[in-house]
Curated annotation (Swiss-Prot):
Organism: Methanocaldococcus jannaschii (strain ATCC 43067 / DSM 2661 / JAL-1 / JCM 10045 / NBRC 100440)
Function recorded in the entry: Transcriptional repressor of nitrogen fixation and assimilation genes. Binds to two tandem operators in the glnA and nif promoters, thereby blocking transcription of the genes.
InterPro entries, sorted: NRD, NrpR, NrpR_dom_sf, RNase_R_HTH_12, WH_DNA-bd_sf
Family: Belongs to the NrpR family.
Assembly: Homodimer.
UniProtKB keywords: DNA-binding, Repeat, Repressor, Transcription, Transcription regulation
GO MF annotations, alphabetized: DNA binding
Source organism superkingdom: Archaea
The name this protein goes by in its record: Global nitrogen regulator NrpR
Note, other: Adopts different quaternary structures in its active apo state compared with its inhibited 2-oxoglutarate-bound state. In the 2-oxoglutarate-bound state, NrpR is inhibited from binding to DNA because its DNA-binding domains are too far apart to recognize the operator DNA sequence.
Region feature NRD 2, mapped onto this chain: 321-542
Region NRD 1: start-end pairs: 85-320
Amino acid sequence: MIIMADLDRKLIEILDILSKSKEPVGAKIIAKELNKRGYKIGERAVRYHLKLLDGMKLTKKVGYAGRVITERGLEELEKANISYRLGSIYSNILEKTISANYRFGYVVINRCQVYADFNDVLKIIKSVYESGLAVGDRVGIIDREKFVEINTLCSLNFDNILLQNGIFPLHVCAGVVKYEDGKPVEFKEIIDYKSTSIDPLRAFIEKKETDVMGIIENGEGYLPANFRYFGVEFLERFETILEIDELKCIISYGTENVLGLDVGDDKVGVALIGGLTPIAPFVENNYCVEICPMSSIVRLESLHKLKKNPRDIVTKKANIRIKTALSKMFNAMAKVTYDIDEADGDVIVNTAFIDKKYLDEAFDILKEAYKKGLGISDRFGIVEENDRIKIQTICAVTLDGIFLRNSVPLIPKYGGILEITEDKERFIDIIGYDGSSLDPHEVFFNFVDCEKTFLAGFREVHRVAREKLEEVLKKLNWNGIKAIGEPNNELYGIGVNKDMCGVVTMGGINPLVLLKENEIPIELKAMHEVVRFSDLKSYKEI
């Protein structure tokens, strides 16, 4: 049996090369492209690697023309080698920024499929552009019968304009910006590009964190947006570019603080409309949508021109500071007072609200979830609040707090999706706690099923504390730790720093996933409250 988690970087690069070609590709071309990417191997070695990929059914030989990637190969490309893919979003941003050429009409687009009536799609798209909430005034709309294909300009095109004028913008993060009275006020949530294996704007849109239609209809809502910065010495040149800018996608810029994000010394921060903004209303209105950010480079003239009313740029500083999930976790640890010997104390819980009519069904589902060991411990809480039921599950940060009280410091690194099947156990997507304001498990909640994919966290512990960690864990006798790795060795595809051991924790939200899988509407908040452990009930007692 082939363990898919063992794919090395050369194999992944070959899959990536094949995925970007519409025609079969031969060993000679693959070897040439690999050399460009820093892998100095010849045609013979490439043919050997291709045979390995053929054996895994990730590629297929097409006569003498070469190889094509299979559907299984495309799926594997999206999952394999998570440590390598962690920087893929940032790498793709740089590649597309450099490869585009707005001056000569070559632009980066996002490609999306909306399963809806063409006229309905056109009406919504026009309303977004007329309100000024799009990058540029060009869009591609094609009726494919079963779906409508939409191609929108990516905000990277503005970065390309800056680059052509000698300004190199450093891409920091993407998020959602709160609007009041039709103007941007502050970033509500963010994810750093370098801290994620998934596209941040796609994640926020699919999680329904946006409200673009609210901005259009009454001036209040949440906009998908990107954030960059560059050296303050370029400010005058930047403002000259704005005077002739055709894309009209800047919503705010300034020094020190821009919409709640610290810029730092001698820098100018810039917030831009996300290129996926015209797509967000379809997700907000529950249309079936497939999103492919930064998909390709096309001729600008191939896109249709729409009426667009540009909005004013805001330069007012915000009075707030965005807190990362890691900062929230460290503060939450301090609130944990659980004593192992007394089997009681304060713990951190996630909360979820459901309609009271689902109470009996939810009880049965949660009991089954805890029987399967999906909870951090065997306890959860049920609280009636008017016509709603509040469900409380112990959060994994409680484990961090308990271990810290026993002089074992765990360092939270990532939250993500852990895939567990017969032939592989690996993380397939992650977000760094220090690079996101949202708990990663809130982002990934709708992408797991608790059958093959689970919410899980990744921590590090120094090798000298590993033995004590195991002692405390044995004494605690909870389910929360999935695995502890060897010093200096990767665990489930994630590497560690020198002399550190990986620690994989199961997500405290996993029991709630089963409610979602059984189509019970749920309102979720991770790491939300402090409760007494004794106030929670064991599933065995209910």
